[in-house]
């Protein structure tokens, strides 16, 4: 397998330039079929200092900013923004969550296109707040991928910046869903997994998928790397524990991960400076590069800012010109547990029953939680609550906001 051997050599050479305890992994797949054409789980399998025997293509890690394209894809699909829509990159408070940019600086007014290319954090969180973290999770499942959330945590805005776990294999599978506009694929090497088409709708409608590729395809290659004709995104996890870069052309997808298998910090690594050069080298040396990114579907094109309808010229601005957090204008929504969930009663180490943590978004504080129509507690400004089920069976959970708007879910509790 010449591609496999080539990527193994790329990984070995790249590993020699990294700290002795830092490993890396690469995975390349055919976006049309799901076939894994090359998979390298470590810089050097026989290197004990790097725990080379651990296959890091299957290890769950924080993706940093690598999921941002999927947030933007949903926003494009829902018609919330266009490439030249202006969004604010300034300090913002999302009900206690205060994201900061990687370089601790803010750009002010930027276009959506610039925000994604520069991987700005605040605009990404603004968009995720608008499309909804739960809706993003559901959409990613179209591509056969379920993000790993912390125990008892509901999907939240931190997902935009890496607040969920994913493997390199699954991340490449998601990007294959971007590259293949027709049908998602499940990656497989024919040994551990079977490559197959997923019987689902396309990950995004064609115009949204093209728009994401059009933006990412114009991101400059890392310094010293020649253009490879790919759309790509990088990611750096909190605390410099993971560096990622994933890219795709019209046929193949390649992902790179760098970090320590023991999850210790690696000061100085970043997706752009550390992982992206390896991505470009591997893509070029694979001999598979060269399939142009798909052309724009009918009716899809870049629209100049001056030609945008008024509603798309600036994102999340109220009639007074003040930036508004979109959640304040939407009715309340229970994001955990979800409708129809089956909840298992857990116990702590001392044998006490653990509460069910409930989480909601949007609405206007204060809020009141009810179970089967009975209030559980006094009104609260928090968007989380705890419920101690009195037994098993079906229950209806409800939250009511200050405007009297309510949201309910039916759940089933079992031992």
What are these language model-derived features?
Residues 231-415:
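Soluble, non-transmembrane domains of envelope/secretory-pathway proteins that act on or interact
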Residues 81-136, 180, 195-218:
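Conserved catalytic neighborhood of penicillin-recognizing serine enzymes
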Residues 98-103, 132-173:
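Mid-domain, small-residue-enriched loop/turn segments at the edges of structured enzyme/sensor domains
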Residues 1-18, 28-30, 39, 47-56, ...:
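A penicillin-recognizing enzyme superfamily signal
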């Amino acid at each position: 397998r010449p591609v496999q051997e080539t990527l193994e050599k790329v990984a070995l050479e790249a590993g020699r330039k990294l700290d002795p305890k830092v490993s890396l992994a690469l995975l390349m797949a055919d976006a049309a079929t799901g076939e894994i054409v090359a998979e390298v789980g470590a810089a050097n399998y026989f290197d004990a200092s790097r725990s080379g025997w651990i296959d890091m293509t299957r290890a769950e890690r924080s993706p940093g900013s690598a999921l941002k394209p999927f947030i933007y894809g949903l926003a494009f699909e829902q018609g919330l923004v266009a490439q030249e829509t202006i969004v604010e990159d300034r300090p913002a408070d999302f009900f206690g969550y205060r994201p900061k940019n990687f370089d601790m600086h803010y750009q002010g007014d930027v276009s959506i296109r610039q925000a994604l290319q520069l991987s700005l954090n605040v605009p990404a969180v603004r968009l995720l707040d608008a499309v909804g973290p739960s809706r993003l999770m559901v959409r990613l499942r179209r591509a056969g991928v379920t993000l790993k959330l912390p125990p008892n945590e509901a999907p939240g805005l931190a997902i935009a910046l890496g607040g969920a776990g994913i493997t390199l294999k699954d991340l490449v599978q998601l990007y294959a869903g971007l590259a293949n506009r027709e049908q998602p694929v499940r990656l497989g090497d024919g040994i551990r997994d079977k490559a197959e088409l997923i019987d689902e709708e396309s990950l995004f409608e064609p115009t949204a998928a093209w728009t994401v590729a059009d933006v990412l395809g114009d991101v400059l290659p890392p310094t010293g790397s020649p253009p490879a004709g790919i759309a790509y995104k990088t990611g750096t996890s909190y605390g410099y524990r993971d560096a990622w870069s994933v890219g795709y052309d019209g046929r193949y997808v390649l992902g790179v991960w760098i970090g320590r298998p023991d999850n210790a910090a690696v000061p100085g690594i970043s997706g752009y400076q550390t992982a992206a050069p390896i991505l470009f080298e591997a893509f070029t040396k694979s001999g598979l590069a060269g399939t142009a990114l798909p052309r724009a579907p009918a009716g899809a094109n870049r629209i100049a800012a001056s030609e945008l309808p008024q509603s798309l010229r600036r994102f999340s601005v109220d009639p007074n010109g003040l930036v508004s957090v979109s959640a304040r204008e939407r009715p309340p929504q229970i994001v955990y547990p979800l409708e129809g969930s089956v909840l298992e009663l857990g116990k702590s180490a001392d044998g006490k029953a653990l509460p069910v943590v409930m989480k909601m978004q949007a609405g206007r504080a204060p809020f009141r939680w009810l179970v089967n129509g009975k209030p559980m507690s006094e009104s609260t400004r928090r968007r989380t609550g705890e419920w101690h089920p009195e037994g098993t069976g079906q229950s209806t959970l409800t939250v009511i906001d200050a405007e009297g708007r309510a949201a309910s879910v039916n759940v089933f509790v079992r031992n």
